[in-house]
Swiss-Prot record:
Residues 1-72, 122-148, 181-211, 325-375, 509-541, 586-622 are annotated as: Disordered. Residues 185-206, 329-345, 354-373 have a biased composition (Polar residues). Gene3D superfamilies: Zn(2)-C6 fungal-type DNA-binding domain. Residues 9-21 have a biased composition (Low complexity). Pfam families: PAS_13. Keywords: Activator, DNA-binding, Gluconeogenesis, Metal-binding, Nucleus, Transcription, Transcription regulation, Zinc. Transcription factor which regulates nonfermentable carbon utilization. Activator of gluconeogenetic genes. Coiled coil: none annotated. This is Transcription activator of gluconeogenesis PODANS_4_8760. Residues 29-41, 54-67 have a biased composition (Basic and acidic residues). SUPFAM superfamilies: Zn2/Cys6 DNA-binding domain. It comes from Podospora anserina (strain S / ATCC MYA-4624 / DSM 980 / FGSC 10383) (Pleurage anserina).
């Protein structure tokens, strides 16, 4: 009997296997239960499981979890997709080669997602790999795309390479430059999306380095249709984005390209672009009229002082709010000073000079630049950026001694005894005496280094609160635990008329509005500390204003009574009360009768009100016209006899030793109106 592995047995088995696969290849109705591993093992082995070399091949169980798995392809071919078999990334795949279908092996068609219905079919092909061939022709057959097989030369081609891409020449400073080149170079040459790397071999500074002539770019002109599948027009690596589809990778890369080049071209240069397809490179566009150190500052300035970003057209006196800075590179901080905001563009002259900016090599450029003073050299860059650079590290370098809280409490009692009557001063002293034992117990074991560290923490906390007060729209105060003013915002100065320098003790306090105090019958002798303070006040340093000097008598007493309860009580607690703030006035009080005792308030002179408003507007942060309108219908309407009816909410910030360190006060004022019956409402 002939063996099963005879000459006719193996051929019959291969023929039968091939016929069975041919019959089941494009059958959509018959289910396929055989795995691809089983089919390939049947093709390569005899019925006995012996291959042509005589070695026995191990047949893996399809359900065995330890069997080797094939790498999943990103997209199956059309034949493997219909047969529901495992395919590979190569084209043609191994299965189509073994079946003789390598000529018709092509990518299968996937169902479009909803967000890709408007996408062209060319953009839905898989992510480009090393087999990408931009010159490969594509044709349509039966609604499907057919790609030619890429050659071996295309597999070793780099990702950004073109067969017809021109090389960029590099010129050194020693080579000759074509005549008439610099005259045709525009000042604001825009860079092409294709950004090759230029290496400068010259040792000269960059301002007078190499100048490259305009070269032809391989990018397609914008007037002609371009191929979105060509990655060279966007100059980014699509394979490195790890996207599953070519369309998503191109969209993400294009958004990144647009965002990276958004700040390259200023809006002033939108009408002076170059021709498409020409790339102008050159570091010597500015000529030799400027210093090398002036180039970074010169490039960061706005083009003209009268452009759309300038603020010089604002009218004086108008009620302007916090103005937007002059441009993206402006160094001016928002403010509402009396002077009108000026454009922050600074350069070589007060007016824009088109000759200097657009024609740097003109004959008259050198003489004009020499005749004008170089203002840019005199500007200190550190001083300009000082308003924007807030670094709290200087606190730990400058604070070398602790704050004298004992002397500050002595000054507070001097103010209380000189401005307040005896009953009110006694009530405030009683409130402070309630927290005195707790303060002494907390500071008993503290060393000098602890006190210095306590002051550093106070300055660091105040540093943060100053930013909060600047951004807050409500009048805000920051005080020490003794009541000295440590920080204030502009809203509070506009409300009360107290300037920041007076509140912080940088200027003498000349306020004469004492809240309607009367003259004592028995004068009090000045102490030794008061006499020394008056004689050597300037030498003793700044003397900030106490919070008790900003309130009338009843409001100050109520504040210190709340302070005695909140100082060592709830650390998150807050207090809200009504008060009367005193307006800052420097008029000399009229010589009234000296026999009045108690709290009789002085009546202001009606004729002196316009003069006082005019004086207050000079020191106000508002302009003259705004201050005049404000005096008639604004904040000045709220004050009665030099007092403002307000409501304040304050809380205490403690330090690391659980002692009251800083309390912050937010003020809110009321609008009063009279009803039909003459009753006053808030």
């Amino acid at each position: 009997m002939p063996e099963d592995g005879g000459p006719f047995g193996s051929e019959a088995a291969e023929a039968s296997g091939a016929m069975s696969e041919t019959e089941n290849e494009y059958d959509d109705h018959e289910p396929h239960h055989k795995d691809e591993d089983d089919r390939m093992s049947e093709q390569n082995t005899t019925p006995d499981g012996v291959d042509a070399g005589g070695e026995v091949k191990k047949k893996y169980d399809p359900k065995d979890p330890l069997r080797p798995r094939r790498k999943k392809a990103r997209r199956a071919c059309y034949a493997c997709q219909r047969a529901h078999l495992t395919c590979g990334d190569e084209r043609p795949c191994q299965r189509c080669i073994k079946r003789g279908l390598q000529d018709s092996c092509q990518d299968g068609v996937r169902k479009k997602a909803k967000y890709l219905h408007d996408a062209p079919p060319e953009a839905l092909r898989p992510v480009l790999g090393p087999n990408y061939n931009p010159n490969a022709p594509s044709s349509r057959h039966g609604g499907q795309r057919h790609h030619s097989v890429s050659t071996d030369a295309s597999t070793v081609r780099t990702f950004f390479s073109h067969s017809n891409a021109s090389q960029y020449p590099v010129y050194s400073s020693t080579q000759s430059i074509p005549h008439g080149l610099t005259e045709s170079l525009p000042f604001n040459s825009q860079q092409s999306p294709v950004s090759p790397t230029f290496q400068q071999t010259s040792s000269n500074p960059p301002i007078s380095g190499m100048v490259a002539p305009p070269v032809s770019s391989p990018m397609t002109p914008f007037g002609l249709p371009f191929d979105p599948s060509d990655p060279n027009i966007f100059n980014f690596n699509i394979d490195g984005l790890n996207f599953g589809s070519h369309y998503g990778a191109m969209e993400f890369g294009m958004l990144g390209h647009m965002s990276s080049s958004a700040a390259d071209t200023p809006p002033q240069e939108s009408g002076m672009g170059q021709q498409p397809g020409d790339v102008h490179f050159g570091a010597g566009l500015f000529g030799s009229h400027f210093d090398n150190r002036m180039l970074p500052e010169f490039l960061g300035l706005d083009a003209g002082a009268n452009g759309i970003y300038s603020q010089g057209n604002l009218q004086h006196g108008l009620p302007h709010a916090y103005a937007i800075p002059a441009g993206p590179t402006s160094l001016q901080s928002p403010s509402t000073e009396n002077n009108s905001p000026q454009p922050t563009t600074f350069g070589f002259d007060d007016r824009p000079s088109p000759t200097m900016s657009q024609y740097p090599n003109a004959p008259g450029a050198k003489s004009s630049s020499n005749s004008r003073p170089s203002k840019l050299r005199k500007l200190d860059k550190v001083a300009i950026l000082q308003k924007r650079q807030r670094d709290p590290s200087y606190i730990y370098d400058t604070v070398k001694k602790s704050f004298d809280y004992v002397g500050s409490f002595h000054k507070l009692f001097e103010v209380l005894s000189s401005r307040f009557s005896q009953p009110h001063a006694a009530r405030i002293a009683k409130s402070l005496a309630a927290i005195r034992p707790a303060l002494l117990a907390s500071t008993r074991n503290l060393t000098t280094q602890d006190l210095i560290f306590m002051e550093q923490c106070f300055q660091r906390t105040l540093f943060e609160y100053e930013d909060f007060m600047t951004q807050s729209s409500s009048p805000t105060l920051a005080c020490r635990r003794t009541g000295e003013i440590a920080g204030v915002n502009k809203e509070f100065t506009a409300l009360t008329g107290w300037t920041k320098d007076v509140l912080l003790g940088k200027e003498p306090n000349r306020n004469t509005n004492l809240g309607g105090t009367g003259v004592r019958t028995t004068p009090r002798l000045k102490s030794l500390n008061e006499s020394s303070a008056e004689n050597g006040g300037a030498a003793s340093g700044p003397r900030p204003v106490f919070l008790a000097e900003l309130m009338d008598h009843e409001s100050a007493v109520e504040f210190y009574e709340d302070y005695s309860q909140l100082a060592f009580g709830d650390s998150r607690g807050r207090m809200t009360r009504k008060c009367r703030l005193l307006k800052y006035r420097t008029d000399k009080p009229a010589a009234g009768g000296g026999g009045g005792a108690g709290e009789e308030e002085r009546k202001p002179d009606p004729s002196a009100a316009p003069r006082q408003q005019e004086k207050d507007s000079r020191h106000s942060i508002l302009s003259n016209r705004v201050a005049k309108i404000d005096g008639e219908h604004g904040i000045s309407k709220l004050e009665r006899d030099g007092k403002l009816e307000c409501s304040y909410t304050w809380t205490i910030k403690r330090d690391m030793f659980d002692m009251p360190m800083l309390f912050v006060i937010n003020v809110r004022f009321f609008f009063f109106f009279d009803d039909y019956y003459g009753r006053r409402h808030c």
